[in-house]
């Protein structure tokens, strides 16, 4: 209304990425609930409303698979060192985002313990999950769910780590759509200084 008073006409309003994603125990609003909550304020303006549903569509379309390399129980905390790290999925370190982490092949004969799932980058922020109750053994494969939104695009080569491969699953078929980066591929554009 203030913009209209200033002679700045609007044709639409973009409310951004409003729809949330269920990571833990949240209940994000449905599209209808979201629209109904905004309708009283926006309807009288007569504007088209645009929304960017990106994360609500893509987050649960992707999972990061990681292997348990080493179990390191201590008197204070139990650490599961995994082969994924903060360079593969930065959201937990950057935003303290809670990611649902599940065993791909759950073990029913292994004791459930509380674990911190940490990478091998040796940074205090290198974790994908803290205080997770899981029955773990070395070489177990874990799925970090909800990693489809911004997972790969925010990944990096920190500590000269190649980014993970990407696999697209369509029905019962899996297709490699991006190969895992290798040390050689990371170095291929680097050059040494000429010898004198």
Where are these regions (language model features)?
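Flexible, glycine/charged-enriched surface loops at secondary-structure junctions
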Residues: 6-12, 48-53
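Glycine-rich beta-strand-to-loop/alpha-helix junction loops that act as flexible
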Residues: 13-22, 53-55
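Charged (often Lys/Glu-rich) extended helix/loop segments that serve as interaction or gating elements
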Residues: 37, 46-196
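Alpha-helix-loop-beta-strand connector modules within alpha/beta enzyme cores
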Residues: 2-6, 34-46
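Short, solvent-exposed loop/turn segments at secondary-structure boundaries
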Residues: 24-29
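Solvent-exposed, well-ordered amphipathic alpha-helical segments
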Residues: 1-4, 10-15, 114
């Amino acid at each position: 209304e203030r913009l209209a008073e200033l002679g700045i006409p609007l044709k639409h309003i973009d409310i951004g990425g409003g729809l949330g994603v269920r990571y833990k125990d949240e209940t994000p609003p449905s599209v209808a609930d979201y629209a109904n909550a905004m309708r009283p304020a926006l309807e009288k303006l007569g504007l088209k409303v645009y929304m960017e549903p990106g994360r609500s569509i893509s987050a649960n379309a992707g999972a990061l698979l990681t292997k348990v390399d080493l179990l390191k129980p201590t008197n204070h905390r139990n650490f599961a060192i995994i082969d994924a790290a903060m360079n593969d999925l930065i959201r937990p370190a950057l935003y303290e985002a809670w990611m649902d982490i599940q065993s791909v092949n759950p073990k029913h004969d292994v004791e459930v313990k509380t674990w911190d799932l940490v990478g091998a980058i040796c940074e205090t922020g290198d974790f994908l999950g803290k205080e997770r109750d899981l029955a773990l053994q070395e070489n177990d494969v874990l799925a970090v769910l909800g990693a489809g939104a911004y997972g790969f695009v925010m990944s990096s080569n920190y500590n000269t780590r190649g980014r993970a491969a990407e696999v697209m699953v369509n029905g019962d078929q899996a297709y490699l759509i991006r190969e895992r980066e290798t040390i050689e591929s990371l170095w291929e554009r680097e050059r040494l200084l000429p010898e004198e």
